[in-house]
Amino acid sequence: MDINLDALVEANRRYTKEGHVATYIPALAKVNPDQLGVCIYDLKENKEFSAGEYDVRFAIESISKVPTLILAILDNGIEKVFSEVGTEPSGFAFNSIMNMQINHKNKPSNPFINAGAIKVVSLLKGKNDEERFKRILDFYRKIMNDDEITLDTEIYLSERETGDINRSLAYYMKGNGIMEGDVTDILDSYFKQCSVLVTAKDLARLGAVLANEGVMPWNGERLFSVETATVVKSLMTTYGLYDESGAFSVHIGLPSKSGVGGGILSSVPNKCGIGLFSPALDVSGNSVASMKLLKEIADKLKLDIFR
């Protein structure tokens, strides 16, 4: 791969000073904000290229919505999942209930806002949180080829302690017949999936599977269908970066998903998966330095899918 990742990481590290770590979840406030790492899984060479803090573990947070959506599709099929969750941008904050109230919709707008992600968790097979989360964790380990992916109990407890808005979303859906099941049990699985520790390398592998149309490039095994890969990448392109999704598509142009743990997952169809980590965030909850670094990588390698 014709790119000096080490030099790019160091050139963009200064942007970590322009953001702030997430503080509304106490455990995330303890993370060193100066970190920046990247990994690219190149499909053509079937090889990983890494630089910076690419192997530092951090909370996956909202990026978890991507692999969990894939698992829900495997459990239920695309038609069933999207009869229960929409595919439209919400026009409201990621943790808002307003879209369902104002538009009188009987389902969340999309699977990447919190209401939609909670609904997706409720669709997973498993009779309780223990079974459901075991399936989530096993799937994450498989799709990211990392058996060391684990739950961070401290972050999970922080998520649960500060999760009242998510509880309100879940109870609203339950009370209006939008979601079935035990709310507390479903939310426990949701809080846990957000609290799983991954690395930039893990995210690059996840992106590579999506880029490779559902086939894990390290062993050639098909994990999910071409159609599923296409749908998920389309959703990532539309609203994967919270309120910055539109600007991100214009300026960088890659199917991506961010999380307040500082990670960004990107998938470049038929080319590569990219994982980035830098915990200092902008006002929208996206990693400042990771976005700057990703822009440079996309420009130098001509990865923008719209150009």
Swiss-Prot record:
One of its GO terms (molecular function) is glutaminase activity. It catalyses: L-glutamine + H2O = L-glutamate + NH4(+). Keywords: Hydrolase. The keyword Hydrolase applies. SUPFAM superfamilies: beta-lactamase/transpeptidase-like. The keyword Lipid metabolism does not apply. One of its GO terms (biological process) is glutamine catabolic process. Homotetramer. Substrate binds at S62, N114, E159, N166, Y190, Y242, V260. HAMAP family: Glutaminase (MF_00313). PANTHER family: GLUTAMINASE (PTHR12544:SF29). InterPro entries: Beta-lactam/transpept-like, Glutaminase. Belongs to the glutaminase family. It comes from the Bacteria. It comes from Clostridium perfringens (strain 13 / Type A). Its EC number is 3.5.1.2. This is Glutaminase 1. The gene is glsA1.
